[in-house]
Amino acid sequence: MSKAATKNLVIVESPAKAATIERYLGPDYTVIASYGHVRDLPQKSRRAAKGSVAAKRPKRKKGDPPAPKPAKGLGSLAVDVENGFTPHYEIIEEKEGRLADIRRAAKGAEAVWLATDLDREGEAIAWHLAEALEIPEADRRRVTFSEITKGAILESFSHPRGINLDLVNAQQARRILDRLVGYKLSPLLSRLVAPRSSAGRVQSVALRLVVERERAIRAFIPRHYSTVELGVRPAVDPDLVIPASLVGPKGENLEVEPEVAEAAVARVTGGVAIVTERTESTRKQRPVPPFTTSTLQQEAGRKHGYRSRVTMQLAQKLYEGVDIGGERTGLITYMRTDSPTLSQQAISEAADVIRTRFGAEAVVEGGRQYASKSKNAQEAHEAIRPTSFHRTPEEVASYLDDRELRVYTLIWRRAIASQMPDKLSATTTLFWSVGEDRLKTNATRTLEPGFTAVYLEGKDDEEEDAEAQLPDLPEGSKGEVATAEAVAHQTKPEPRFTEPTLVKELEKHGIGRPSTYAAIIERIQEREYVDRDRENRLRATRLGETVCDLLTTHFTAFVDLGFTAGMEEELDAVAEGRADWREVLGKFWATFEPLVTEKATSIGAGEYRNRPSDEKCSEGHPMEERLGRFGWYLACSLYPEHSERKSLSKVIGDDTPGGDVPTLEGAGLPCPQCGAEHGGKMAQRRSRFGYFLGCDRYPECKFIPKAEVPEEFRLAFEALCPVCGGEHGGKLRPRRNNKRNTYFYSCDRYPECKTIRPRPTGATHAECGATIGKDDEGGICTRCGARVDLPEGELVGLVIAGGTADPLAFAPKRGRRVAADGKAKAEGNKAKVASRARTVKSKGKPKRIPAAAAVAAAELSASDAAGGEDEAT
């Protein structure tokens, strides 16, 4: 700490909000960040964990108290199942330096305030901090707030409470459950299916939903039918053509065979249509509630295509605060909630804004409140809303990037709309007769837009009805059937899940919680159980289907939707003090552990790696589907006597024409390297990165033609490397990422220089003379990280000024285990932090890394602290 002593030490999770809270509380308070959890179940067994606290404990000196003995029989679980499921927590290795800083600061403080997030995860972090700091129970001051505003902060500090152990036990039970399932099932899957296969209590159920939807799509048999769509020209307005449909005697839509539809077209075309019935009806449409975590993820995915993880990262930044007019301000309330309710203060403020912008008639007297539709809505938090409705999207637009503004606009508009009147619409229905045939016309018009003047919810799979205005056509009015057409249709299966619709399905079944949705979906994609089709929808891979088959066959109850939802209800009961967490775990373990033990010996080793198929090899022998290093393939069942093999796509069904297996130009041509001398030819081959051309004499000839960079990724100018260009002349060039099948821009002196930057634009940054690149957020200097505005049109040769240097812009965020600099407690301290460095252990040897990179990586881990399940590989 920079101060020798402080009266009050406040511990929060994220450094981004520390400076804001410290400013609100005044000089008697110092705020420091824990960067998420500081203690957890160890990731390795005690014997293997070289970096664990136990392994690094110093030698005892004379007079030291006896060292605590490690619990026996814990193994890699770190949970004593024989002693009430007592967990063995350890300080997270990369948090030891951070905890030491907090401990030093706490020693000189008169009071320590635990201000971690207000959900179960935050409550558990507060408890772990209190335990690690050895704060007496009577002195544990716990404060929570749902928004980072001065009023909310001061109010929470005026009413501290103790740590809610029911919430802690609910989180602890979930953590142990996930450890038991992950560490017991994952090794079994890795042995029986593929290395690195994993199972999780919730992720496996999410996988089952995706697999079952995929199989339903494959098994679906479409039904073909036709409808008859017509256009009627009324006698009162010959220039107007009113759309109509052929219906049955009761007004039902007719779905008929194509020949029946064609006969109807011939029968009614040119006929006289007479209005036999006219009805008017009105409909009220209520506004949708303010956002919860799941509905925000769904809507951001539908309207902007954001993945759940991206949405949560953007919402986290809006919650923690952005710099507005030189002052960091929290823009939204806490973003992990399943409650759609608003406080009375928020409702009153929303009414003021509505009255000003839309008039007094747009204010709903008394406001609106909403009840959660979630099966197992958790603690009574507020919905996600702006911290101030007076802070409109237009007012904050200049302080946010495009993606942040889109998310803030969604939240502001949805919350405002939730307090506005219903939409009122009128529908006119006309029934016509043409001889013995009956036609129907529907036309809907808006009478009062109500809340839709501000916000209209997106749809997953349907379009909004188009509005139409009909002329005054009383019964008996006549017209001519001007057009008639038989329109062919076919029934369609339910579509593949998108991330938003999968979140919706999980929530509908009561599976998962606000803090876990994004992590669940990320995990099943990381393990390659699920990938994305051309429309960005989730589809199960062969590996995912195989893992799902094993789990549903041998562990049916534990991947059952009802069972998993029931476990969530039991955890909720623990959080509410209605159930004992040890009893919940004991009941689960009593059935789970014997089943895993039995299946470990009864399932055949090759049962899920070799599967029969309907294919025959060139000699007529049956072929088997087998799982190899690079995925699934077909092999002759007589291998090794007959070694014929065929590639299989990652997803079942993509092997058919029109699937994802490409046809590469050049296959069959002579190999440029050995064709003349040895007769080698170019053949289409496959690796774990996809299909490529290579010599068919491999490994004798290893020739692979260099892939040509597609036109859209080429640069028409030279861009110097911002790191080594001046001294060594390195240039940024497009390089292919084989795994993701895309291109990135890196120094052509690799591996001497490993610089990677966004795509160069050809413009130069005036302040530092480096090339300006362009990423998803706009222009960025490739040297100093300053954000700049890019004008429209040609950029090559332009010199653009502006932007503030950002030393964290290109800091590494993955691949290193780092400790955050204990003296960097606020994002506003970036420039000072960038000059320091911490020494961390890497493979047993000291290694210096920039402290800025340490902070960046620690912030990333802090933002991810709330989600995920255990797995052992």
Located regions from the model:
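Metal- or metallocofactor-binding catalytic centers and their adjacent structured scaffolds
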Residues: N253-P290, S477
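Short acidic, hydrophobic short linear motifs in intrinsically disordered regions
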Residues: V275-R278, R286-A300, G326-M335, P493-E505
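Conserved short loop/turn motifs at secondary-structure junctions
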Residues: T6-K7, D117-L118, V193-S198, E280-P289, ...
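C-terminal or mid-to-C-terminal helical accessory/interaction module adjacent to the motor/catalytic core
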Residues: D101, I148-L230, E280-K284
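Alpha-helical scaffold elements adjacent to nucleotide-binding pockets in ATP/GTP-utilizing enzyme cores
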Residues: T20-Y24, D101, A105, A124-A132, ...
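Intrinsically disordered, low-complexity regulatory segments
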Residues: M1-R175, K184, V247-G248, E252-E255, ...
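Conserved nucleotide-binding/hydrolysis micro-motifs of P-loop NTPases
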Residues: P15-A18, Y35-D40, L118-G122, S146-G151, ...
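Basic, low-complexity terminal or inter-domain segments flanking catalytic cores
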Residues: S2-K7, A19-T20, S186, A219, ...
